[in-house]
Amino acid sequence: MKPQMHLAIDVSWTQVETIWREPGARVNRHYPDVGLFEDIARVAERGLLDLIFFGDSTGIPNTWKNSIDDAVRYGVAWPRLDMSPWITAMSRVTKHVGFGLTYATTFMHPFYVARLLNSLDHITNGRIAFNVITSQRKADAQNYGFDELMEHGQRYDRMDEFMDVCQALWRSVEPDAFEWDRATGRVANPDKVRAINHVGRFFKVKGPLSVPPSPQVVPVLIQAGGSPRGTRTAARFVDHVFGARKPIPAMSKQRAEIDAALLAEGRDPSKVGVIWSTQVMVGETEAEAKRMRERLIDGVPREAVGAWLSHNTGFDMSTLPPRFTLRELNERIVAANASPVGFVAQLAQALGDDGEITLDEFMEHGLRTATSYATTVAGTAAQIADDLEERFEGSGSRGGFMLRHSQCEQIDMLHNIVDLLVPELQRRGRFRTAYSGRTLRENLAT
């Protein structure tokens, strides 16, 4: 039997992709619409997908030109909902598909997040995943009482401690602690409910968690840090790593780096998958899919690209000179206590650190990256399945793909994934024909 891949869909509304302007899209004056999210969940489950994923940020992007104006004008990373209550609605119309929530350990408190995710795991009968992130976004920091972001390494130190606290809390009540003995009146055995008494650099938490253990006990844990420090931190606790689509040798190299970090932590690499983020446009014909891709690219305003890239790096791209090298750009980003994003590294790989680029050229590269269209696979179901299968094998056949969100804002396009791509992968023996697990963790077992 061939190794099978997992499939997730990313429904992290950003609007910068402009697909909301296409005929049939349901993001409109009535947004948000709970019916849209329920329909997405129904279609995803009909396609036997593993996970519906929600990225998050809590501040309106304000790094570009030191203003929120272009982000508001063009819908860049806003509006964004707290998806936790919406997941309850989606879970009521499904039984198997999982839900991934994102919280930044840079600002949140572990007791709150541990309790919330435990409660949602109960509501969904064991279908919750936690995407653990740091934040490099000043707009987020400013909504949590910080004028500036903490230093990069410190953000990961805080994440390490945050996850230590969460995992201790999730295990602070034993699965058999509850008795519900009518004769004695005993609800639970106090010997099986223990304080964690955590005192650390960032948090002081007595515990225990004030809720019963959930079906998964610990939600499925996901992390996307691509830096060496991010990889080391992820290796301590993750079940799956999010990776960005790149050339197959680079995917294989990243998989090897993750495996080495897992081994250094005494963990079995075969138990941890990589979910590669991949934008696909499935059409009845290749020409139809490619026309859609080009039409969407043409609809994105330059100011929206600048706002998105500045938000994601924490560096104001509007301050760049007309010409610069990638080395100079990286120096500016680091000096601003910001974080280079993947496409800067990709450009450096293509041009060299000292290769000069004009601002217009940079923004054109940024356009295709901010919208994910630089790496979009546009074609028929068979063509996309060829690509996914090649990448799956080339990166170790452990994990799968997260199909990016522009497909999902338009239900008809999500139908193309479920009705065209999924059957093609099933014919090749690369995707399940039925859910086999009771919980998300069981369905995601690699």
Language-model-detected regions and their locations in the chain:
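Hydrophobic faces of well-ordered beta-strands that scaffold small-molecule active sites
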Residues: M5-I9, I52-F54, V97-Y103, G126-V132, ...
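Conserved, mostly hydrophobic/aromatic
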Residues: L7, A44, L48, M90, ...
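An alpha-helical appendage that flanks or caps ligand/catalytic pockets
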Residues: M1-Q15, G153-Q216, P249-A256, A260-F392, ...
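Hydrophobic, small-residue-rich alpha-helical packing segments that form membrane-like cores
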Residues: A8, S12, R26-G35, I87-G98, ...
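Acidic (Asp/Glu)-rich catalytic clusters
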Residues: M1-K2, E45-R46, T88-K95, D121-R127, ...
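A conserved active-site cap/scaffold subdomain adjacent to cofactor or substrate pockets
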Residues: G230-P247
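Short, acidic/polar
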Residues: Y31-A44, Q223-T233, T380-G394
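N-terminal beta1-alpha1-beta2 module of alpha/beta enzyme domains
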Residues: M1-V93, Q216-P219, R332
